[in-house]
Amino acid sequence: MALANPDSLKNSNLSSLPTIAAIATPLGRGGVGVIRLSGTRAYSIACTLTGKSEFKPRMASFCRFYQADGTVVDEGLVLYFKGPHSFTGEDVIELQGHGGMILQNQLLARVFELGAKQAGAGEFSYRAFDNDKLDLVQAEAIADAIDATSAAAASSAIRSLSGEFSKKINQLLEQLIHLRLHVEAAIDFPDEEDVDFLSDGVIQGKLEQTQEKIQHVLATAKQGQLLRDGIHVVLAGRPNAGKSSLLNRLAGQERAIVTDVAGTTRDTLQETVVLNGLTLHLTDTAGLRETEDTVERIGIERARTAITQADILLMVYDVTCDLEEEITPLQLAEQLFGELPEAKCLLIIANKSDLLNHNSSKGMTSISQEEIYNRGYEQVNVSCETGAGIDDLVETLCAKVGFHPPENSLIARTRHLDALRRTAEYLAEAHEQLTVFKAGELVAESLRQAQHSLGEITGEFSADDLLGKIFGSFCIGK
Protein backbone atom coordinates (compact mmCIF):
# COMPACT_ATOMS: atom_id res chain seq x y z
CA MET A 1 0.00 0.00 0.00
CA ALA A 2 1.42 3.39 -0.97
CA LEU A 3 2.20 6.19 1.42
CA ALA A 4 -0.50 8.80 1.72
CA ASN A 5 0.01 11.93 -0.35
CA PRO A 6 2.76 13.94 1.40
CA ASP A 7 0.84 17.14 0.59
CA SER A 8 -1.93 15.88 2.86
CA LEU A 9 0.48 15.17 5.70
CA LYS A 10 3.28 17.72 5.83
CA ASN A 11 2.55 20.50 8.32
CA SER A 12 -0.98 19.15 8.78
CA ASN A 13 -3.08 19.65 11.90
CA LEU A 14 -2.65 16.38 13.78
CA SER A 15 -6.33 16.24 14.72
CA SER A 16 -7.29 16.18 11.02
CA LEU A 17 -5.18 13.14 10.22
CA PRO A 18 -6.79 9.71 10.41
CA THR A 19 -5.68 7.27 13.07
CA ILE A 20 -3.64 4.61 11.31
CA ALA A 21 -2.98 0.98 12.17
CA ALA A 22 -0.92 -1.88 10.78
CA ILE A 23 0.65 -5.17 11.75
CA ALA A 24 4.22 -4.30 12.77
CA THR A 25 5.64 -7.83 12.95
CA PRO A 26 6.20 -10.29 10.08
CA LEU A 27 3.10 -12.22 9.10
CA GLY A 28 3.16 -15.92 9.82
CA ARG A 29 3.48 -18.31 12.70
CA GLY A 30 5.18 -16.75 15.72
CA GLY A 31 5.07 -16.28 19.46
CA VAL A 32 4.06 -12.61 19.44
CA GLY A 33 2.34 -10.40 16.89
CA VAL A 34 2.25 -6.61 17.28
CA ILE A 35 -0.33 -4.21 15.88
CA ARG A 36 0.60 -0.55 16.03
CA LEU A 37 -1.84 2.39 16.07
CA SER A 38 -1.03 6.10 15.85
CA GLY A 39 -3.33 9.11 15.94
CA THR A 40 -5.84 10.98 18.05
CA ARG A 41 -8.25 8.02 18.24
CA ALA A 42 -5.65 5.38 19.13
CA TYR A 43 -6.29 5.66 22.88
CA SER A 44 -10.10 5.50 22.63
CA ILE A 45 -9.89 2.55 20.22
CA ALA A 46 -7.73 0.67 22.74
CA CYS A 47 -10.22 1.41 25.53
CA THR A 48 -13.19 0.16 23.49
CA LEU A 49 -11.26 -2.88 22.26
CA THR A 50 -10.31 -3.99 25.78
CA GLY A 51 -13.18 -2.65 27.91
CA LYS A 52 -10.65 -0.66 29.96
CA SER A 53 -11.29 2.94 30.92
CA GLU A 54 -7.67 4.00 31.38
CA PHE A 55 -4.11 3.13 30.38
CA LYS A 56 -1.02 4.58 32.03
CA PRO A 57 1.64 5.85 29.62
CA ARG A 58 4.61 3.51 29.20
CA MET A 59 3.06 0.84 31.41
CA ALA A 60 2.20 -2.61 30.03
CA SER A 61 -1.36 -3.75 30.73
CA PHE A 62 -2.57 -7.33 30.23
CA CYS A 63 -5.96 -7.29 28.50
CA ARG A 64 -8.42 -9.31 26.47
CA PHE A 65 -9.33 -7.97 23.05
CA TYR A 66 -13.08 -8.13 22.33
CA GLN A 67 -15.24 -8.27 19.23
CA ALA A 68 -18.35 -6.07 19.08
CA ASP A 69 -20.51 -8.97 20.35
CA GLY A 70 -18.28 -9.51 23.38
CA THR A 71 -16.43 -12.59 22.16
CA VAL A 72 -12.68 -12.64 22.73
CA VAL A 73 -10.47 -12.18 19.67
CA ASP A 74 -7.19 -12.62 21.54
CA GLU A 75 -5.42 -11.56 24.70
CA GLY A 76 -2.10 -9.87 25.30
CA LEU A 77 -0.38 -6.66 26.33
CA VAL A 78 -1.32 -3.06 25.60
CA LEU A 79 1.36 -0.36 25.61
CA TYR A 80 0.37 3.31 25.52
CA PHE A 81 2.76 6.08 24.46
CA LYS A 82 1.18 9.50 24.91
CA GLY A 83 2.09 12.09 22.29
CA PRO A 84 4.31 13.94 21.76
CA HIS A 85 6.50 11.51 23.72
CA SER A 86 6.22 8.68 21.19
CA PHE A 87 7.86 7.48 18.00
CA THR A 88 5.45 9.37 15.74
CA GLY A 89 4.83 12.31 18.06
CA GLU A 90 1.15 11.29 18.22
CA ASP A 91 -0.67 9.03 20.67
CA VAL A 92 0.61 5.52 19.93
CA ILE A 93 -0.85 2.18 21.02
CA GLU A 94 0.83 -1.19 20.59
CA LEU A 95 -1.28 -4.34 20.88
CA GLN A 96 0.94 -7.32 21.58
CA GLY A 97 -1.06 -10.47 20.96
CA HIS A 98 -0.24 -13.95 19.76
CA GLY A 99 1.48 -14.44 16.43
CA GLY A 100 -0.25 -16.08 13.49
CA MET A 101 -2.01 -14.67 10.45
CA ILE A 102 -5.57 -15.54 11.50
CA LEU A 103 -5.43 -13.95 14.95
CA GLN A 104 -3.51 -10.90 13.75
CA ASN A 105 -5.84 -10.25 10.82
CA GLN A 106 -8.94 -10.68 13.00
CA LEU A 107 -7.58 -8.24 15.57
CA LEU A 108 -6.59 -5.73 12.89
CA ALA A 109 -10.05 -5.98 11.30
CA ARG A 110 -11.60 -5.17 14.69
CA VAL A 111 -9.31 -2.14 15.03
CA PHE A 112 -10.50 -0.95 11.61
CA GLU A 113 -14.13 -1.41 12.72
CA LEU A 114 -13.41 0.98 15.58
CA GLY A 115 -12.27 3.73 13.21
CA ALA A 116 -8.62 3.23 12.35
CA LYS A 117 -7.38 3.26 8.75
CA GLN A 118 -4.79 1.00 7.14
CA ALA A 119 -1.35 2.62 7.36
CA GLY A 120 0.57 3.08 4.15
CA ALA A 121 4.13 1.89 3.66
CA GLY A 122 6.39 3.94 5.91
CA GLU A 123 3.53 6.11 7.18
CA PHE A 124 4.46 5.77 10.86
CA SER A 125 8.00 6.90 10.04
CA TYR A 126 6.66 9.71 7.85
CA ARG A 127 4.57 11.03 10.73
CA ALA A 128 7.66 10.90 12.95
CA PHE A 129 9.52 12.93 10.31
CA ASP A 130 6.56 15.29 9.90
CA ASN A 131 6.50 15.90 13.66
CA ASP A 132 10.27 16.49 13.86
CA LYS A 133 10.90 13.32 15.85
CA LEU A 134 13.57 12.33 13.35
CA ASP A 135 15.06 13.72 10.15
CA LEU A 136 15.16 12.11 6.72
CA VAL A 137 18.55 10.45 7.24
CA GLN A 138 17.34 8.87 10.48
CA ALA A 139 14.10 7.72 8.85
CA GLU A 140 16.03 6.06 6.03
CA ALA A 141 18.34 4.45 8.58
CA ILE A 142 15.35 2.57 10.03
CA ALA A 143 14.76 0.85 6.69
CA ASP A 144 18.49 0.34 6.17
CA ALA A 145 18.86 -1.34 9.57
CA ILE A 146 16.00 -3.72 8.73
CA ASP A 147 17.40 -4.50 5.27
CA ALA A 148 21.07 -4.76 6.34
CA THR A 149 22.92 -7.68 4.76
CA SER A 150 25.91 -7.61 7.11
CA ALA A 151 26.69 -6.86 10.75
CA ALA A 152 28.78 -3.86 9.70
CA ALA A 153 25.90 -2.43 7.64
CA ALA A 154 23.48 -2.93 10.53
CA SER A 155 25.83 -1.19 12.99
CA SER A 156 26.35 1.69 10.57
CA ALA A 157 22.60 2.07 10.10
CA ILE A 158 22.06 2.23 13.86
CA ARG A 159 24.73 4.95 14.14
CA SER A 160 22.92 6.93 11.43
CA LEU A 161 19.62 6.35 13.24
CA SER A 162 21.14 7.74 16.43
CA GLY A 163 21.93 10.95 14.54
CA GLU A 164 25.68 10.72 13.87
CA PHE A 165 25.39 11.25 10.10
CA SER A 166 22.82 14.02 10.56
CA LYS A 167 25.15 15.75 13.01
CA LYS A 168 27.91 15.87 10.40
CA ILE A 169 25.52 17.29 7.80
CA ASN A 170 24.06 19.86 10.20
CA GLN A 171 27.53 21.05 11.17
CA LEU A 172 28.33 21.60 7.49
CA LEU A 173 25.03 23.41 7.00
CA GLU A 174 25.88 25.67 9.92
CA GLN A 175 29.24 26.47 8.33
CA LEU A 176 27.58 27.25 5.01
CA ILE A 177 25.05 29.53 6.66
CA HIS A 178 27.79 31.50 8.43
CA LEU A 179 29.78 31.68 5.21
CA ARG A 180 26.75 32.98 3.32
CA LEU A 181 26.13 35.61 5.99
CA HIS A 182 29.75 36.72 5.75
CA VAL A 183 29.61 37.00 1.96
CA GLU A 184 26.23 38.74 1.85
CA ALA A 185 27.30 41.20 4.53
CA ALA A 186 30.33 42.07 2.42
CA ILE A 187 28.02 42.64 -0.55
CA ASP A 188 25.34 44.63 1.28
CA PHE A 189 27.69 46.83 3.30
CA PRO A 190 30.76 47.38 1.13
CA ASP A 191 31.59 50.78 2.65
CA GLU A 192 31.15 49.90 6.33
CA GLU A 193 34.80 48.83 6.79
CA ASP A 194 38.08 49.71 5.19
CA VAL A 195 38.78 46.02 4.55
CA ASP A 196 37.55 44.38 1.34
CA PHE A 197 36.12 41.15 2.74
CA LEU A 198 36.03 39.51 -0.68
CA SER A 199 39.77 40.04 -1.10
CA ASP A 200 41.24 39.75 2.38
CA GLY A 201 41.42 35.95 2.30
CA VAL A 202 39.09 35.32 5.25
CA ILE A 203 36.13 34.17 3.17
CA GLN A 204 38.42 32.16 0.90
CA GLY A 205 39.93 30.40 3.91
CA LYS A 206 36.53 29.54 5.37
CA LEU A 207 35.31 28.35 1.99
CA GLU A 208 38.32 26.07 1.51
CA GLN A 209 37.85 24.63 5.01
CA THR A 210 34.25 23.83 4.13
CA GLN A 211 35.31 22.22 0.84
CA GLU A 212 37.80 20.03 2.69
CA LYS A 213 35.16 18.88 5.17
CA ILE A 214 32.67 18.13 2.38
CA GLN A 215 35.25 15.89 0.72
CA HIS A 216 35.83 14.07 4.01
CA VAL A 217 32.10 13.48 4.52
CA LEU A 218 31.76 12.41 0.87
CA ALA A 219 34.53 9.83 1.32
CA THR A 220 32.79 8.52 4.44
CA ALA A 221 29.45 8.40 2.61
CA LYS A 222 30.99 6.43 -0.28
CA GLN A 223 32.04 3.74 2.19
CA GLY A 224 28.58 3.82 3.75
CA GLN A 225 26.92 3.41 0.37
CA LEU A 226 29.09 0.37 -0.38
CA LEU A 227 28.20 -1.07 3.03
CA ARG A 228 24.50 -0.57 2.34
CA ASP A 229 24.25 -1.58 -1.32
CA GLY A 230 27.28 -3.79 -1.91
CA ILE A 231 28.35 -4.41 -5.50
CA HIS A 232 26.91 -6.45 -8.35
CA VAL A 233 29.45 -8.97 -9.63
CA VAL A 234 28.66 -10.91 -12.80
CA LEU A 235 30.56 -14.08 -13.75
CA ALA A 236 30.86 -14.54 -17.52
CA GLY A 237 32.91 -16.57 -19.95
CA ARG A 238 32.90 -19.58 -22.24
CA PRO A 239 31.01 -22.77 -21.30
CA ASN A 240 32.78 -24.92 -18.67
CA ALA A 241 35.22 -22.13 -17.78
CA GLY A 242 34.46 -22.58 -14.08
CA LYS A 243 31.94 -19.79 -13.51
CA SER A 244 29.54 -21.91 -11.47
CA SER A 245 32.42 -23.44 -9.53
CA LEU A 246 33.66 -19.94 -8.71
CA LEU A 247 30.21 -18.87 -7.52
CA ASN A 248 30.03 -21.96 -5.29
CA ARG A 249 33.49 -21.25 -3.90
CA LEU A 250 32.63 -17.61 -3.12
CA ALA A 251 29.26 -18.58 -1.64
CA GLY A 252 30.79 -21.32 0.48
CA GLN A 253 28.14 -23.80 -0.61
CA GLU A 254 26.95 -25.73 -3.66
CA ARG A 255 24.52 -23.18 -5.09
CA ALA A 256 25.09 -23.86 -8.78
CA ILE A 257 25.03 -27.23 -10.53
CA VAL A 258 28.49 -28.14 -11.82
CA THR A 259 29.09 -30.87 -14.44
CA ASP A 260 31.56 -31.59 -17.21
CA VAL A 261 28.80 -31.00 -19.77
CA ALA A 262 29.19 -27.67 -21.56
CA GLY A 263 26.07 -25.54 -21.29
CA THR A 264 24.90 -26.90 -17.91
CA THR A 265 24.02 -23.38 -16.74
CA ARG A 266 21.03 -22.27 -18.80
CA ASP A 267 19.84 -19.26 -16.81
CA THR A 268 21.23 -16.59 -14.51
CA LEU A 269 21.67 -17.60 -10.87
CA GLN A 270 21.91 -15.01 -8.08
CA GLU A 271 23.56 -15.37 -4.70
CA THR A 272 24.40 -12.71 -2.11
CA VAL A 273 27.42 -13.17 0.14
CA VAL A 274 29.38 -10.96 2.55
CA LEU A 275 33.16 -11.27 2.24
CA ASN A 276 35.64 -9.01 4.06
CA GLY A 277 32.64 -6.92 5.12
CA LEU A 278 31.59 -6.17 1.53
CA THR A 279 28.25 -7.47 0.24
CA LEU A 280 28.66 -9.16 -3.14
CA HIS A 281 25.56 -9.73 -5.25
CA LEU A 282 26.86 -12.53 -7.46
CA THR A 283 25.29 -13.54 -10.77
CA ASP A 284 26.33 -16.74 -12.53
CA THR A 285 25.53 -16.78 -16.24
CA ALA A 286 25.23 -19.18 -19.15
CA GLY A 287 28.42 -19.85 -21.09
CA LEU A 288 28.85 -17.56 -24.09
CA ARG A 289 28.97 -19.40 -27.40
CA GLU A 290 27.08 -19.84 -30.65
CA THR A 291 24.32 -22.43 -30.20
CA GLU A 292 21.22 -23.75 -31.93
CA ASP A 293 19.65 -24.77 -28.62
CA THR A 294 16.67 -22.45 -28.05
CA VAL A 295 16.76 -22.64 -24.25
CA GLU A 296 20.52 -22.12 -24.07
CA ARG A 297 20.28 -19.18 -26.48
CA ILE A 298 17.73 -17.50 -24.19
CA GLY A 299 20.12 -18.05 -21.27
CA ILE A 300 22.95 -16.42 -23.22
CA GLU A 301 20.74 -13.40 -23.97
CA ARG A 302 20.01 -13.10 -20.25
CA ALA A 303 23.73 -13.37 -19.55
CA ARG A 304 24.44 -10.41 -21.80
CA THR A 305 21.69 -8.42 -20.09
CA ALA A 306 23.25 -9.20 -16.70
CA ILE A 307 26.65 -8.08 -17.98
CA THR A 308 25.30 -4.61 -18.78
CA GLN A 309 24.14 -4.28 -15.17
CA ALA A 310 27.40 -5.33 -13.52
CA ASP A 311 29.53 -3.14 -11.28
CA ILE A 312 32.38 -5.59 -11.81
CA LEU A 313 32.54 -8.29 -14.47
CA LEU A 314 34.62 -11.41 -13.82
CA MET A 315 35.61 -12.89 -17.18
CA VAL A 316 36.46 -16.48 -16.25
CA TYR A 317 38.55 -18.77 -18.46
CA ASP A 318 39.99 -22.25 -17.99
CA VAL A 319 43.77 -22.34 -18.44
CA THR A 320 43.65 -26.04 -19.38
CA CYS A 321 41.49 -25.52 -22.46
CA ASP A 322 42.99 -25.30 -25.94
CA LEU A 323 41.11 -22.49 -27.67
CA GLU A 324 43.10 -22.28 -30.90
CA GLU A 325 39.97 -22.46 -33.02
CA GLU A 326 37.83 -20.35 -30.70
CA ILE A 327 37.86 -16.75 -29.54
CA THR A 328 40.81 -16.16 -27.20
CA PRO A 329 40.27 -15.09 -23.57
CA LEU A 330 41.63 -11.61 -24.30
CA GLN A 331 39.39 -11.22 -27.34
CA LEU A 332 36.40 -12.27 -25.25
CA ALA A 333 37.45 -9.87 -22.48
CA GLU A 334 37.60 -6.97 -24.92
CA GLN A 335 34.26 -7.95 -26.41
CA LEU A 336 32.61 -8.09 -22.98
CA PHE A 337 34.28 -4.88 -21.80
CA GLY A 338 32.63 -3.11 -24.71
CA GLU A 339 29.23 -4.20 -23.35
CA LEU A 340 29.86 -2.84 -19.84
CA PRO A 341 28.44 0.49 -18.66
CA GLU A 342 30.88 3.40 -18.56
CA ALA A 343 33.33 3.43 -15.63
CA LYS A 344 32.64 -0.20 -14.75
CA CYS A 345 35.38 -2.74 -14.19
CA LEU A 346 36.42 -6.06 -15.77
CA LEU A 347 38.73 -8.60 -14.13
CA ILE A 348 40.16 -11.61 -15.95
CA ILE A 349 39.96 -14.75 -13.80
CA ALA A 350 42.33 -17.59 -14.74
CA ASN A 351 40.73 -20.73 -13.30
CA LYS A 352 42.64 -23.98 -12.58
CA SER A 353 45.80 -21.92 -12.16
CA ASP A 354 47.10 -24.55 -9.73
CA LEU A 355 47.79 -26.73 -12.77
CA LEU A 356 50.07 -24.18 -14.44
CA ASN A 357 53.09 -25.52 -12.56
CA HIS A 358 52.43 -29.13 -13.51
CA ASN A 359 53.84 -30.96 -16.51
CA SER A 360 50.34 -31.19 -17.92
CA SER A 361 50.37 -27.45 -18.52
CA LYS A 362 51.68 -27.86 -22.06
CA GLY A 363 49.38 -26.17 -24.52
CA MET A 364 47.49 -24.19 -21.88
CA THR A 365 45.99 -20.80 -22.73
CA SER A 366 47.33 -18.76 -19.81
CA ILE A 367 47.82 -15.14 -20.82
CA SER A 368 51.06 -13.40 -19.92
CA GLN A 369 50.81 -10.67 -17.30
CA GLU A 370 52.63 -8.30 -19.66
CA GLU A 371 50.03 -8.82 -22.37
CA ILE A 372 47.21 -8.25 -19.87
CA TYR A 373 48.88 -5.08 -18.56
CA ASN A 374 49.42 -3.75 -22.07
CA ARG A 375 45.71 -4.19 -22.78
CA GLY A 376 44.76 -2.36 -19.57
CA TYR A 377 43.28 -5.35 -17.73
CA GLU A 378 44.12 -7.18 -14.53
CA GLN A 379 44.18 -10.95 -14.02
CA VAL A 380 43.66 -12.93 -10.83
CA ASN A 381 44.75 -16.56 -10.78
CA VAL A 382 42.43 -18.89 -8.86
CA SER A 383 41.70 -22.55 -8.39
CA CYS A 384 38.06 -23.30 -7.69
CA GLU A 385 39.14 -26.86 -6.85
CA THR A 386 41.60 -25.96 -4.06
CA GLY A 387 40.44 -22.44 -3.17
CA ALA A 388 43.82 -20.96 -4.04
CA GLY A 389 43.62 -17.30 -5.05
CA ILE A 390 40.06 -16.76 -3.76
CA ASP A 391 41.24 -14.49 -0.94
CA ASP A 392 43.29 -12.51 -3.46
CA LEU A 393 40.21 -12.17 -5.65
CA VAL A 394 38.09 -10.83 -2.78
CA GLU A 395 40.83 -8.34 -1.82
CA THR A 396 41.05 -7.22 -5.44
CA LEU A 397 37.28 -6.69 -5.61
CA CYS A 398 37.40 -4.55 -2.46
CA ALA A 399 40.32 -2.55 -3.85
CA LYS A 400 38.62 -1.99 -7.22
CA VAL A 401 35.64 -0.27 -5.58
CA GLY A 402 37.75 1.42 -2.89
CA PHE A 403 36.12 -0.44 -0.02
CA HIS A 404 37.91 0.24 3.26
CA PRO A 405 35.24 1.40 5.71
CA PRO A 406 36.41 3.12 8.91
CA GLU A 407 35.59 1.49 12.23
CA ASN A 408 32.73 3.91 12.91
CA SER A 409 31.32 4.07 9.39
CA LEU A 410 27.89 5.52 8.66
CA ILE A 411 25.30 4.10 6.28
CA ALA A 412 24.59 6.19 3.19
CA ARG A 413 22.43 6.05 0.08
CA THR A 414 23.03 6.99 -3.52
CA ARG A 415 20.93 10.13 -3.10
CA HIS A 416 23.21 11.23 -0.24
CA LEU A 417 26.25 10.88 -2.51
CA ASP A 418 24.49 12.80 -5.29
CA ALA A 419 23.63 15.64 -2.90
CA LEU A 420 27.17 15.78 -1.50
CA ARG A 421 28.69 15.81 -5.00
CA ARG A 422 26.39 18.64 -6.07
CA THR A 423 27.29 20.53 -2.91
CA ALA A 424 30.99 20.10 -3.69
CA GLU A 425 30.42 21.32 -7.27
CA TYR A 426 28.62 24.46 -6.08
CA LEU A 427 31.40 25.16 -3.59
CA ALA A 428 33.96 24.80 -6.39
CA GLU A 429 31.94 27.31 -8.42
CA ALA A 430 31.86 29.68 -5.45
CA HIS A 431 35.63 29.35 -5.05
CA GLU A 432 36.21 30.21 -8.71
CA GLN A 433 33.82 33.18 -8.60
CA LEU A 434 35.62 34.45 -5.49
CA THR A 435 39.27 33.91 -6.41
CA VAL A 436 39.13 34.56 -10.16
CA PHE A 437 36.25 36.97 -10.77
CA LYS A 438 35.72 38.58 -7.33
CA ALA A 439 31.99 38.31 -8.08
CA GLY A 440 30.33 38.51 -4.67
CA GLU A 441 26.76 38.06 -5.91
CA LEU A 442 27.69 34.90 -7.82
CA VAL A 443 29.59 33.56 -4.82
CA ALA A 444 26.49 34.08 -2.67
CA GLU A 445 24.26 32.32 -5.21
CA SER A 446 26.58 29.31 -5.46
CA LEU A 447 26.67 29.07 -1.66
CA ARG A 448 22.86 29.22 -1.55
CA GLN A 449 22.64 26.34 -4.01
CA ALA A 450 25.23 24.39 -2.03
CA GLN A 451 23.20 24.86 1.15
CA HIS A 452 20.03 23.73 -0.63
CA SER A 453 21.71 20.58 -1.99
CA LEU A 454 23.15 19.69 1.40
CA GLY A 455 19.81 20.31 3.10
CA GLU A 456 18.17 17.70 0.86
CA ILE A 457 20.02 14.99 2.77
CA THR A 458 18.31 15.58 6.11
CA GLY A 459 15.04 16.73 4.55
CA GLU A 460 15.44 20.43 5.24
CA PHE A 461 14.84 21.03 1.54
CA SER A 462 13.05 18.07 -0.07
CA ALA A 463 10.37 17.83 -2.74
CA ASP A 464 7.19 16.00 -1.78
CA ASP A 465 7.60 13.43 -4.55
CA LEU A 466 11.03 12.52 -3.16
CA LEU A 467 9.56 12.04 0.31
CA GLY A 468 6.82 9.83 -1.12
CA LYS A 469 9.38 7.62 -2.86
CA ILE A 470 11.57 7.31 0.23
CA PHE A 471 8.83 6.47 2.73
CA GLY A 472 6.90 4.41 0.20
CA SER A 473 9.81 1.95 0.11
CA PHE A 474 9.40 1.18 3.83
CA CYS A 475 7.63 -1.79 5.39
CA ILE A 476 3.96 -1.54 6.30
CA GLY A 477 3.93 -0.88 10.03
CA LYS A 478 7.11 1.23 10.09
UniProtKB/Swiss-Prot annotation:
Q: What is its EC number?
A: 3.6.-.-
Superkingdom, according to UniProt?
Bacteria
Q: Where in the cell is it found?
A: Cytoplasm
InterPro entries associated with the record: G_TrmE, GTP-bd, GTP-bd_TrmE_N, GTPase_MnmE, MnmE_dom2, MnmE_helical, P-loop_NTPase, Small_GTP-bd
Name all TrmE-type G domain ranges: 230-402
The reply to whether Metal-binding figures as a keyword in the UniProt entry is: yes
Which positions bind (6S)-5-formyl-5,6,7,8-tetrahydrofolate? Answer: 36, 94, 133, 478
Cofactor: how bound: Binds 1 potassium ion per subunit.
Q: Which GO terms describe its molecular function?
A: GTP binding; GTPase activity; metal ion binding
Enumerate the Pfam families for this protein: MMR_HSR1, MnmE_helical, TrmE_N
Query: Where, in this chain's numbering, is K(+) bound?
Result: 240, 259, 261, 264
- Needed co-factor(s): K(+)
| Recorded GO CC terms | cytosol
Binding residues for Mg(2+), per the UniProt record?
A: 244, 265
- What are the protein's UniProt keywords? Cytoplasm, GTP-binding, Hydrolase, Magnesium, Metal-binding, Nucleotide-binding, Potassium, tRNA processing
A GO BP annotation: tRNA methylation
Residues annotated to bind GTP: 240-245, 259-265, 284-287
Q: What PANTHER family does the annotation carry?
A: TRNA MODIFICATION GTPASE GTPBP3, TRNA MODIFICATION GTPASE GTPBP3, MITOCHONDRIAL
Q: What does this chain do? A: Exhibits a very high intrinsic GTPase hydrolysis rate. Involved in the addition of a carboxymethylaminomethyl (cmnm) group at the wobble position (U34) of certain tRNAs, forming tRNA-cmnm(5)s(2)U34.
Assembly description: Homodimer. Heterotetramer of two MnmE and two MnmG subunits.
Which family does this protein fall into? Belongs to the TRAFAC class TrmE-Era-EngA-EngB-Septin-like GTPase superfamily. TrmE GTPase family.
What is this protein called in UniProt?
tRNA modification GTPase MnmE
Gene (name only): mnmE
